Regions:
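Short aromatic/hydrophobic "clamp" motif used to bind/position activated sugar donors
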Residues: 84
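A conserved acidic beta->alpha catalytic loop
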Residues: 31, 39-48, 88-91
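Cell-envelope/extracellular polymer assembly enzymes that use nucleotide-activated donors
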Residues: 3-6, 34, 170
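Glycine-rich, basic loop-to-helix element that forms the pyrophosphate-binding segment
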Residues: 61-79
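Conserved nucleotide-sugar donor-binding catalytic segment
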Residues: 129-206, 210
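Conserved donor NDP-sugar-binding/catalytic core segment of glycosyltransferases
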Residues: 92, 96-126
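Acidic helix N-cap motif at the loop->helix transition within catalytic regions
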Residues: 16-19, 44-52, 96
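N-proximal low-complexity "stem/linker" segments adjacent to membrane-targeting elements
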Residues: 1-26
Length: 247
């Protein structure tokens, strides 16, 4: 019999933050969990941290890959749980999260459940917010708060690795446009560290490409947006480098 939850963490040289992520799995009040860690070939003490937590890490794979979404797809291929959550190696769950999702999902055949996220800048709390799924056509929701039925991946596919930063947005938008049931919970489920992989200016361009791929953006709007953000990046680049050269 499969476990109820499969949780996936992708990491690379995450020695400073991974233990906190693992502890957030260990401290859950609901324990029918399969924990999968996919490492991209770390050269720091990340592997030692994983080995020290084999009582929590059920499945572990380490080796070079082609990027974060390839690694996430590897984790999905190994997952046997009915519901799947993906938590980054610098993010962490609230202790009640799995129990909360179980209580809501046990009477659902399949769907996506998501909620509020607490955002941090460094060690300082920045804000708490959640984007309702009805806004998915315009903006992404916080992926670490999402729990998705395994069956939906089987029906509609995994992460599209053509997107380098916003493949999680593409995945959720794909499900939403297919008519999948979403449930938004006004409760903090996860904590997210700003400044990581998905916090750069480049995510806006990739998110625009996602919307264009789903025919949600006209060619005229796409070109205008792309030119604006390309100009913004160039101005920022030259301004920064000019400041660096001032004696």
């Amino acid at each position: 019999m499969s476990t109820y939850f499969s949780i996936i963490t992708v990491c690379l040289n995450s020695e400073k933050t991974l233990a906190r992520t693992i502890d957030s799995i260990r401290n859950q009040t609901f324990r029918d969990v399969e924990y999968i860690v996919i490492d991209g070939g770390s050269t720091d003490s990340t592997l030692s941290i994983i080995n020290d937590n084999k009582d929590i890490v059920n499945i572990f794979h380490s080796g070079k890959d082609h990027g974060i979404y390839y690694a996430m797809n590897k984790g999905l291929s190994l997952a046997t749980g009915k519901w799947i959550g993906i938590i980054n190696s610098d993010d962490w769950y609230e202790p009640h999260t799995f129990q909360t999702i179980f209580d809501l999902s046990k009477n659902m055949n399949e769907g996506v459940i998501h909620g509020l996220c607490r955002y941090y800048k460094g060690e300082k709390e920045d804000k708490v917010m959640g984007i309702h799924h009805n806004n998915l056509r315009e903006m992404a929701i916080c992926h670490p708060t999402c729990f998705i039925s395994n069956s939906l991946y089987q029906k509609y596919g995994n992460f599209n690795t053509n997107f380098t930063i916003a493949a999680d947005y593409d995945l959720l938008l794909r499900f939403y446009l297919k008519g999948v049931d979403f449930l938004f919970l006004e409760k903090i489920l996860a904590n997210f560290t700003l400044g990581g992989f998905s916090s750069s200016e480049f995510v806006r361009i990739d998110a625009l490409n996602v919307r264009r791929n789903h025919n949600l953006v006209s060619s005229k709007t796409y070109i205008a947006f792309y030119l604006y953000h390309s100009a913004y990046r160039l101005i920022h680049f030259f301004t920064f480098n000019k400041l660096k050269t001032i004696p």
